[in-house]
Amino acid sequence: MLALTTPPLTTEQAHLKIQGGYRLSGEVRISGAKNSALVLMAGALLAADTTILRAVPDLADIRRLGEILQALGVKVQRLGSEAIAIDATALNTNDPPYALVSQLRASFFAIGPLVARLGVARVPLPGGCAIGARPVELHVRGLQAMGAEVTIDHGVVTARATKLKGTRIYLDYPSVGATETLMMAATLAEGETTIENAAQEPEVVDLANFCIAMGAKIYGAGTNSITIVGVDRLHGTEYEIIPDRIEAGTFLLAAAVTRSAITLAPVIPSHLTPVVAKLAEMGAKIEFPDPTRVCFTPAQRYRATDIETLPYPGFPTDMQALMMTLLAISEGNSLVSETVFENRFGHVAELNRMGADIRVKGNHAAIRGVPHLSGAPVTGTDLRATAALVVAGLAAHGETHVYGLQHLDRGYWQIEAKLQGLGAQLERYVPSAVPSPVL
């Protein structure tokens, strides 16, 4: 069984207390990618065998998905702090617990492997961060094109297919979730499936490489056209997840706003290209002394720039809030355009509480740089917004209290310890001695 460790206490009153204005220095270790770990855990369901995943961060979302898989008859076991063994031999079609599924959008990834391997899947519509609709229509249409009968009733998606059939699927939008779901389903389908306008994110490539290690035949991952030739069965494997490009970007921004020189490892340089390009444009110096390490040297003054979020290889939406923190204290006027998700400017009001000058109209945010931010009590509304407020607190004059840690704990493993190791002055404050429930 999955060894569920008690997560940090995160009641609504719990918060990070940050003393701003301290320079960072040293090297920080980047964890495995949360977004890869979640989909690869679902991908392990494709094999009636045991799979070992390495570089899996011990996060709340990982623990939730582990419990969901256990409800489906899967044996999930932690092997130390960074590896998980998944034995999907006894996979069944039980309904996953809604209390868990409602908190985790990644739970929907199970629908592809379930219908491909067992012929039926019943998965409640998912939850997660409240940053937009993020609908599942593309997943549903793709499964229907492969011959599945799909119904949505009382909030539960049911998919049935005696045997999925390979086909040509065009995605109206290069959705990462739809690409991953359909790619997993196609690995065990009869014949050849081609996904056009596919997502090109590194996490999609990681999933493809993982499935290939299990015996799948997948070609073109990382381009906008992916071809999958179905096989009869897949086998277990041992696989190491890619480093988390968003965590790496978070630490680059922490260094930038505090005007600090730090080193990050391990990283995959090509995954950081959009963020590194913008930081260099603003005046920072970024070097890659070897293929797994990045060194950041700050600018004395940062120049304003414009940001438009786009699917990979464009600027990642998950870095938008973090980059806005730096733009808020840069010289000049900047414009941020959010084209991937609606409702993703929840951090703006909180940054303005700290002295930023940001105005939002529709999916655009106009930023007038100010000399500095000031510490204040602020609350994160989603995972990346909360991370952005932590980064803002590191740069602010005075003391910042960041609330909403339940969001932060979903996506950053040991972030306080890592920042403290670089010299940041922060601590988690919990006013109550009563622990939150074990996830």
Swiss-Prot record:
Claim: Cytoplasm is one of the keywords in the record: yes
Keywords noted in UniProt: Cell cycle, Cell division, Cell shape, Cell wall biogenesis/degradation, Cytoplasm, Peptidoglycan synthesis, Pyruvate, Transferase
GO CC terms of this entry: cytoplasm
Entry annotation: catalytic residues: C129 (proton donor)
GO terms, biological process: cell division; cell wall organization; peptidoglycan biosynthetic process; regulation of cell shape; UDP-N-acetylgalactosamine biosynthetic process
Reaction equations catalysed: phosphoenolpyruvate + UDP-N-acetyl-alpha-D-glucosamine = UDP-N-acetyl-3-O-(1-carboxyvinyl)-alpha-D-glucosamine + phosphate
Lineage: superkingdom: Bacteria
Residues the entry annotates as binding phosphoenolpyruvate: K34, N35
Catalytic activity, EC: 2.5.1.7
CDD domains given in the database record: UdpNAET
Single GO MF annotation: UDP-N-acetylglucosamine 1-carboxyvinyltransferase activity
Any coiled-coil regions, as ranges: none
InterPro entries given in the database record: Enolpyruvate_Tfrase_dom, Enolpyruvate_Tfrase_sf, MurA_subfamily, RNA3'P_cycl/enolpyr_Trfase_a/b, UDP_GlcNAc_COvinyl_MurA
Pathway: Cell wall biogenesis; peptidoglycan biosynthesis
Pfam families in the record: EPSP_synthase
Positions with a binding annotation for UDP-N-acetyl-alpha-D-glucosamine: R105, R134, P135, V136, E137, L138, D318, V340
Modified residues (2-(S-cysteinyl)pyruvic acid O-phosphothioketal): C129
Subcellular location as annotated: Cytoplasm
Keyword Cell cycle: yes
Family affiliation: Belongs to the EPSP synthase family. MurA subfamily.
Role: Cell wall formation. Adds enolpyruvyl to UDP-N-acetylglucosamine.
Protein name: UDP-N-acetylglucosamine 1-carboxyvinyltransferase
Organism: Thermosynechococcus vestitus (strain NIES-2133 / IAM M-273 / BP-1)
